[in-house]
C-alpha cells in the first residue's frame, strides 16, 4: 500500500510543535471544515504529515505520522467530524516559511497557496520532497 502525504495546520497558541514533541502521540481534533474533515478520513496509518504553524509563524516546522486512522472526534457535539492520532517523527532542521513556499515554482500548485484557509490538505510526493530539500537550507 502506498504512503500518502499531508499538511496539518495548527495555531501554536492552541497546539504547538513543542506540545506535540512532549506528547509524542496525540489526537488531532477540532477540525470543523468539511473538506479538511474529508481529508482526515482519507489518511492511513503511516502517512507522513508536515506540521505547520499558522497565524503569526506561518511555517512548516516538523513531521508527524498518522498513528491511528479516523474515529469520531470526541470534542464534536454534532458527531459529524472525525479525529486522528499523530505521532511525532522529527523537527525540521530549518522551518520552511510560507513566503519561501510561495517563491518556489515547484510548489506553486500546493493547496497551501491555492486554498490557504484549508487546515488539512494533501500533498504530492514531489511537493513533500521539495519541502524536505528546503528544510535543509537556512534562509
Give residue ranges: language-model regions.
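Hydrophobic beta-strand signal
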Residues: 50-51, 65
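Long, low-complexity intrinsically disordered regions
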Residues: 109-139
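Short, charged beta-turn/beta-strand-edge "cap" motif at the junction between a beta-strand
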Residues: 52-58
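Aromatic- and Lys/Arg-enriched surface recognition patch
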Residues: 61-121
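Short, charged, solvent-exposed linker or helix-capping segments at domain edges/interfaces
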Residues: 19, 95-101, 132-134
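GIY-YIG nuclease signature motif recognition
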Residues: 8, 64, 124
